[in-house]
Amino acid sequence: MVALTWDDTGKRQYEMGTDHGVLYPMTTTGTYGTGVAWNGLTAVTESPDGAEANDMYADNIKYASLRSAETFGATIEAYTFPDEFIPCDGGAEVTDGVVFGQQSRSKFGFSYRTQIGNDAKQDAGYKLHLVYGATASPSEKSYETINDSPEGMTFSWEIDTDPVSVEGHPELKPVASITIDSTKVDKKKLTALEKKLYGDTTGEPTLPLPGEVYTMLKAAA
């Protein structure tokens, strides 16, 4: 038997940062189109909701506690956004450089990366975050005069999601988010997934559906 210890060297982990943002616009057929790099990404705040307790009482005692369905939301912040995000933000580009607002909002997928560090190595690994079935809400844009300490304007969007079924795995509930830890996942499988997400010389970047992600990462090495 081994006694518990705390804060061993190399195990004082933390997460920070966000990078490698990718937008995957949803096509009219319900699939995700070619991914585009999202430059200027400054923050992603995940905001899950639901899973609230609904207590049941019988025989003058607490009999059971039921949990409501959980939903996934987030806030994306960035200095800029790709042109492909315009339809997702309720815009229609009627000709080059001319955008009509207050249009239907397209769905999209999204991926980004956060860094894992520890006391021994600041860049020990990273987590990939995949988001499905997202729609963006209108957000405030504040344009201010340039003064002696100018700052770039930050755009912000609150997103809601519709979960997607995990094909071939009825034991799993539909999901809207997947997180992959590079320090634990097989490196070859992770590389194959990243080729899908970011593209390479043999294929365009695309967002694999949850069932495909499961198969890629769960399959025997």
Task: For each feature predicted by the language model, list its residue ranges.
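Extended aliphatic helical segments
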Residues: 2, 22, 36, 44, ...
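Mixed-charge, glycine-accented linear interaction segment located at domain edges/termini
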Residues: 138-221
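Structured, beta-strand-rich domain cores
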Residues: 63-139
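Acidic-enriched, low-complexity/disordered segments with a strong bias for Aspartate over Glutamate
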Residues: 7-10, 19, 49, 55, ...
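Solvent-exposed edge beta-strands and adjacent loop segments
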Residues: 1-83, 131-152
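Intrinsically disordered, low-complexity coil segments
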Residues: 4-11, 27-32, 120-122, 164-174, ...
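Generic serine detector
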Residues: 9, 47, 65-68, 104-106, ...
